[in-house]
Amino acid sequence: MVEHIDTSLIDWSRAQFALTAIYHWIFVPLTLGLAVIMGLMETIYYRTGNDFWRRTAKFWMKLFGINFAIGVATGLILEFEFGTNWSNYSWFVGDIFGAPLAIEGILAFFMEATFIAVMFFGWNKVSKGFHLASTWLTGLGATISAWWILVANAWMQYPVGMAFNPDTARNEMVDFLAVATSPMAVNKFFHTVLSGWVLGAIFVVGVSCWYLWKRRDKQFALSSVKVAAWVGLVAAVLSAWTGDGSAYQVAQKQPMKLAAMEGYYDGQEGAGLVAFGILNPQKQTPDDGVDPFLMRIEIPKMLSLLGERDADAFIPGINDLLEGGYTLKDGSTALSAEEKIARGQMAITAFAKYRKAKAEGNDEEAQVARQTLTENMPYFGYGYIKDANELVPNVPLTFYMFRVMVILGGYFILFFLVVLFLAYKRNLSKLRWMHMVALWTIPLGYIAGQAGWAVAECGRQPWAIQDMLPVSAAISKLDTGSVQLTFFLFLILFTILLIAEIGIMLKAIRKGVEH
């Protein structure tokens, strides 16, 4: 079905997509977060009639607009890459993956495009109520956009609601509701959007503390800090809660990712969660006998509680997942990776025989081949795997990025608590050390978001679609040099856009709120 493709092409195509996604995610969470904060500020203006809140909301809207424009540009490039660099993927599952993206474009993007114009240019031209509705609908459009994009991503992590049609060599959607409301999608949506609110709150607090540092616009800065810190605290706590739900879904649907997140090689009942650990760089393969840790501190039984909601449950490690033989929750015995690979190869062979028999008009042979294909279709993607060790993601990257995300998530809760205490009980405007802490927390918000996506995407390698299609089989057959060229062109373009956004934002921040 898929010709052999040079690994360097795979690596460069992955690098290009990762580059685009990383840059795009610089802008998206700030859009989601600022939308809520400026909506709350305009709501206060609508209810009180105090023009101070109108001016405050307009200032943050200005920064929202700058960020929104750059985010749209990078997002469009990201969607085009599915067709240019990942054509096998697009052909194989385009009927399913394309549906949520189409809905996102038709519904959410047009909602944003319509109401953002009213939000920016409708002051004193439409009623206060209609303008307020436009502001919230702009934010709602961005959130709906995130929903459908995350539905598409969640489907790649946990493919449901589809059936493979051997006549077209495509997966076709049979249950839209299952795709749109899968537990993986629901948890991913809330966790991701709430993390965007956290970043937006950090950004507003940080910029406001810069004004306090400069002894400018004290009332504006303190009022912005209070609104943003409350949003941030609620979002950070809820993000931790939804993160627990996401981890549970990973344990159920992507056990290899969970094992990589914990550097967990040998399964056991009552498995502990690594609170702190340093991986052994000498550990090269799962079965090399090298201790995976130089040191670690565990919370007893916490991984079993997290992954199965049972402190004594068995959690399979990397070696268990490769070797099989343990008992699954339904009472069946887990297959080894080698057995899954063999069954995947049977599925691919049966598919080829089916296509040949259909072309020759041999219905009897086609029926036999189709039966074999149906029986082994759950392992179809494994047929492209050459070595069982390919099924193990990058453990150090996944392990450390997970801890970066979790540690920073805990720090953000503490940060917002301290900010609120100082804003209400102390004179925050005079605490210059806190101003610097707030400013330095801004990049930490971005790092936490990128770390989360590194866990989500790198932790499911080698799969483009979990258990169904590996990255090596999803790619377009392109000239490696052309991918390298566009990689560096995108790197230059995105860097220019990022520098432009930072420059325009800094200019707007220095100018300050209108008086």
Task: Label each PLM-derived region with a short phrase.
Residues 2-515:
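Polytopic transmembrane helical bundles with strong interfacial aromatic enrichment
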